[in-house]
C-alpha cells in the first residue's frame, strides 16, 4: 500500500499559512494590501488585544461580486495575474492568491463585500477553513473582513504569538508605512476601542505632519530626481531628525515598502560625515523603476526584492 498521500486542501492552506501568516501583523498587512489594490480611498483598521482576539479591515473599495467573494478564499485564486508574463510586470501589492485562504484556515473569519455600483452585498463566514454560511448582507460599502481567534485551531502556533502590546506596536509600525506610501488614502487605526491614527487623504508632506507633528515639516528636505529609467522622490530629514535608533527610514519601490541594506546604505552615505556613529537619519523615499527590472516574487512577506542591476540603482540614489 502506498504511504504517500495527497494532503487535504485545508491542511495545505494551514501549511501555507506558516509561510504567509506568521502573526497578527501578517494578517493586517495582507488585508490592507488588498484594500489598496481595490482602489479604496478610506481604510479603517481595528484590533483587539494586539490582534490576538480580533482584527478588522474595512474599506470603501470596488468590492467583490457574489461569485468572486466565494472564489477569493480558494488557494491561488487571484484577479491580479493570469499568465507567467504577468509575473514580470506586477503592479499590485498582492498577486499570489494565497493570503485569504491561509488566513481563513487558521481563524474564524467573516468577509462582507458588495461590488461597486450594485445594491446586493454578501457575507461569507469561514471557521478553520470550513465554510459555515453565505448570506445576503445589506447596507454595505466596499469590503469588510473580520478575523477572530487567530491560530485557534493550531495551539502550537498560537502560543508563540508575542504579547498583545508587542503585536500592537508592530501593527502600528506597519500602518505608518502604509500611510506614508499612500498619502492619497485616508486611514484610521484603533486598538481596543482607542483611536491611534485618523488621517484624511492629502500630500506626502501633510501625511508626514499627521504622523510626526506639524513642526517636523520644518526639518524636511525635498528630493526629486529623474534619471531614465529611474525616478526618486520624497523627503529626507535634516540633522534635527536624526535618532539613535532605526525605524524612521522608509524606502518604497513602485509603492511597495521594502527592506534593502544596499539601497538604504546609499542614503546613509550622504549623512556619514554629518552624524555620529549609531545615529540614523529620517527619510521617506519613493523609487520608481520599470516593473520588468525587479522581481518581487522572492519572499512570502514580499519585503525583499531582487533587482537586475542593484549597484546601478545604488549609485543613482547616492548621487
Name these PLM-found stretches:
Residues 1-319:
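N-terminal phosphate-binding caps/lids of nucleotide- and nucleic-acid-binding domains
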Amino acid at each position: 500500500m502506498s504511504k504517500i498521500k495527497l494532503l487535504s486542501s485545508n491542511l495545505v492552506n494551514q501549511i501555507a499559512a506558516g509561510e504567509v501568516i506568521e502573526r497578527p501583523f501578517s494578517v493586517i498587512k495582507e488585508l490592507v494590501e488588498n484594500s489598496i489594490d481595490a482602489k479604496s480611498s478610506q481604510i479603517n483598521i481595528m484590533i483587539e488585544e494586539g490582534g490576538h482576539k480580533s482584527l478588522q479591515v474595512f474599506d470603501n473599495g470596488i468590492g467583490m461580486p457574489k461569485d468572486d467573494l466565494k472564489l477569493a478564499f480558494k488557494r491561488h485564486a487571484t484577479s491580479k495575474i493570469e499568465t507567467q508574463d504577468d509575473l514580470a510586470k506586477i503592479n499590485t501589492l498582492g498577486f499570489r492568491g494565497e493570503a485569504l485562504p491561509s488566513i481563513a484556515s487558521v481563524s474564524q473569519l467573516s468577509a462582507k463585500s458588495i461590488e461597486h455600483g450594485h445594491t446586493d452585498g454578501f457575507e461569507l463566514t469561514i471557521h478553520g477553513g470550513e465554510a459555515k454560511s453565505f448570506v445576503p448582507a445589506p447596507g454595505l460599502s466596499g469590503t469588510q473582513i473580520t478575523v477572530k481567534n487567530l491560530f485557534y485551531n493550531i495551539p502550537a502556533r498560537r502560543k508563540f504569538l508575542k504579547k498583545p502590546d508587542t503585536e500592537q506596536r508592530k501593527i502600528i509600525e506597519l500602518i505608518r508605512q502604509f500611510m506614508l506610501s499612500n498619502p492619497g488614502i485616508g486611514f484610521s487605526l484603533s486598538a481596543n476601542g482607542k483611536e491611534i491614527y485618523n488621517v484624511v487623504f492629502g500630500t506626502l508632506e501633510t501625511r508626514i505632519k499627521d504622523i510626526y507633528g506639524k513642526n517636523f515639516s520644518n526639518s524636511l528636505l525635498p528630493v526629486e530626481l529623474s534619471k531614465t529609467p529611474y525616478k526618486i522622490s520624497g523627503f529626507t530629514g535634516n540633522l534635527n531628525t536624526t535618532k539613535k535608533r532605526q525605524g524612521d527610514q522608509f524606502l518604497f519601490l513602485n509603492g511597495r515598502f521594502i527592506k534593502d541594506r544596499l539601497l538604504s546604505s546609499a542614503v546613509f552615505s550622504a549623512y556619514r560625515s554629518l552624524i555620529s556613529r549609531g545615529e540614523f537619519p529620517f527619510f521617506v523615499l519613493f523609487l520608481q523603476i520599470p516593473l520588468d527590472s525587479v522581481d518581487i516574487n522572492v519572499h512570502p512577506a514580499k519585503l525583499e526584492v531582487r533587482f537586475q542591476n542593484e549597484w546601478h540603482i545604488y549609485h543613482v540614489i547616492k548621487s
